[in-house]
From Swiss-Prot:
InterPro entries: DNA-dir_RpoC_beta_prime (IPR045867), RNA_pol_asu (IPR000722), RNA_pol_N (IPR006592), RNA_pol_Rpb1_1 (IPR007080), RNA_pol_Rpb1_3_sf (IPR042102), RNA_pol_Rpb1_clamp_domain (IPR044893), RNApol_RpoC1 (IPR034678). GO terms for molecular function: DNA binding; DNA-directed RNA polymerase activity; magnesium ion binding; zinc ion binding. GO terms for cellular component: chloroplast; DNA-directed RNA polymerase complex; mitochondrion. This is DNA-directed RNA polymerase subunit beta'. Keywords: Chloroplast, DNA-directed RNA polymerase, Magnesium, Metal-binding, Nucleotidyltransferase, Plastid, Transcription, Transferase, Zinc. Binds 1 Mg(2+) ion per subunit. Binds 1 Zn(2+) ion per subunit. Its main location: plastid. DNA-dependent RNA polymerase catalyzes the transcription of DNA into RNA using the four ribonucleoside triphosphates as substrates. It comes from Buxus microphylla. Zn(2+) binds at residues 69, 71, 87, 90. The gene is rpoC1. Belongs to the RNA polymerase beta' chain family. RpoC1 subfamily. The keyword Membrane does not apply. The keyword Chloroplast applies. Mg(2+) binds at residues 489, 491, 493.
Amino acid sequence: MIDRYKHQQLRIGLVSPQQISAWANKILPNGEIVGEVTKPYTFHYKTNKPERDGLFCERIFGPIKSGICACGNYRVIGDEKEDPKFCEQCGVEFVDSRIRRYQMGYIKLACPVTHVWYLKRIPSYIANLLDKPLKELEGLVYCDFSFARPVAKKPTFLRLRGSFEYEIQSRKYSIPLFFTTQGFDTFRNREISTGAGAIREQLADPDLRIITDYSLGEWKELGEEGPTGNEWEDRKIGRRKDFLVRRMELAKHFIRTKVEPERMVLCLLPVLPPELRPIIQIDGGKSMSSDINELYRRVIYRNNTLIDLLTTSRSTPRELVMCQEKLVQEAVDTLLDNGIRGQPMRDGHNKVYKSFSDVIEGKEGRFRETLLGKRVDYSGRSVIVVGPSLSLHRCGLPREIAIELFQTFVIRGLIRQHVASNIGVAKSKIREKEPIVWEILQEVMQGHPVLLNRAPTLHRLGIQAFQPILVEGRAICLHPLVCKGFNADFDGDQMAVHVPLSLEAQAEARLLMFSHMNLLSPAIGDPISVPTQDMLIGLYVLTSGNRRGICANRYNPCNRGNRVNFQNERIDDNNYKYTKEKDPYFCSSYDAIGAYRQKRINLDSPLWLRWRLDQRIIASREVPIEVHYESLGTYHEIYVNYLIVKSVKKEILCIYIRTTVGHIYFYRKIEEAVQGFFRACSYGT
């Protein structure tokens, strides 16, 4: 097991067969060495105990229950006085059951097997190192063809062929007998080679330094030749030079790391610890197993068949042995990377088996899901939606998420207020969702910030603090102005919420991480909280209003007579629907908003709003469009966007401006923001 205090880094590379056996082998008191998995079985169907020498064997991987062997005997773990440490009957070691998370086994392969990652992946390291085409190596690995390897100073079939021709008549009966005997297999195996064993021999023969020097010399020769004038030939030379560079880098890497290239061909296949490929019992006596177990069983079945062919049956044709070696190679390929050679292996339900590569690679793989990023307590995750009514430093948490995040705080509040006598009663009240639970939750949330994070966290603004409030629904509500820091939008993005527990974390969240305190980009200093496209569209809709102008209402086509002057008519193409009603008058913005909420007017309906006396309007030299006189002597001067009511003595009594409810809303929000800014500045000084 890796000690996290002693080991600060992890390196993945090729391992020797001796190291694989050292990981797995254990020596029993009787001198027996265990560690090799020889049987494809998992659990016995009657006793429901692991099969001996199987994929879940307790002798190889350790006991299922701490300190209890397969016989049922118990020993105290860690007690040096307890002797022996192994059960004399079953051979199981008396250790903690957590050993099954890291104790490995191995399968001794009857024939060498090429590691498919180094053969089929791009680039192919085996093909680059041997300087041979990938298709040729594949045909060799999967026994589609063989290559000659005559040995010096020994008779070969090619050398003896001449003597056979002269003595063909005298030996015409003995030669066929020779080809059917076991001696011919030895004779042939010395001359030809196929399978992964041939690859292993080629990887073990050459000197890496010679490969580096030879590749460097060829690269220099190609560089001295210069361009040939033929575009196709120049491209071919360029590709060859690039290949030579990759080959030299690969050879130097093997030299630097002191790794033998023949390790890319496996003789021992490691078996993962059982806890990493579990079998889970479910209701009805059924079980769910990891796909890797089935792939391991497939390898063991085929490997045992090959062992039987090589040991028990001496008269087995060589072609049958080669076919079985190919099946073993394909089984190991499927275990390591299912589907890398084409059609993936499927189960009875037409579901693709998850191989070792599928388990470790990708976003949901072992590294990114478990090692690099782990799930933590006091956290949740949900889709984000816009919260237009929220303040910049607030976020909306769904009730379902909030009650889970702050459950321990709510339980403490229920017990302190004597609403619940113990934790069990408090949890039952939370499950029943009593009203007192939500009241206590509101009190807890008022003094506790939360952290929102959106992956990937590329800079410090990727995680910010907010003051949570309860909202309905199942989505997290977020102010649109903080989206730029998270690089988020509302098209289905998800964000994680975390609860800072310690006082130091809460202080850091309040003083440094609150969203309203991170308004500028830490990189370039530009404003980070700027209106997004959604906000700009909303502001446009809010303030667009009715753009027909004052004249369009007076010269209404629906109410025109013979005195209509079409030259003075102001009509926009997008406003084709008019009414005969006059624009309403309101004494205050509250009356106008109340009328809108009562649905008496629309958001963009034009209206007259009484306004304070504005010197800019009074001093304006604009000529009124028309003047309305009343019976008491007062009169109204009507302009394009405002109206002035004057007395008989030409004193200004009041002013009305022509606006919409949308403009009123927008103006009030701007006014509140400005007043809040000045109030904050006055507090600061």
